[in-house]
Curated annotation (Swiss-Prot):
It is found in: Cell membrane. Its main location: membrane. The lineage of its organism: Bacteria, Bacillati, Actinomycetota, Rubrobacteria, Rubrobacterales. Residues 53-80 have a biased composition (Basic and acidic residues). InterPro entries: TatA/B/E (IPR003369), TatA/E (IPR006312). It is a single-pass membrane protein. This is Sec-independent protein translocase protein TatA.
Amino acid sequence: MIPANFGGTELIILLVIILLLFGAKRIPELARGLGTGVREFRKGTSGAYEELEEKKGEEEKDEGGKKEAEASGRGEEEQQARAAGEAGRKQG
């Protein structure tokens, strides 16, 4: 099991191992590649987050429009029922 907290000694040992494995010349290349990868990952996650927010907003607008349409539809039905009732009273 790998410990979650690294102390100063562990970090120094890790850096020495990396230096021995890759050499001093390749470490800047690796750091650049890692930085580029992290940047692309952040762009991707922020882009996905923005898409989700846009879709959420569109769905809320659609639901709001449906509720308004249903409410206006109910209002029209009530008006028709009232008109029919009044017409029936006038005839009777």
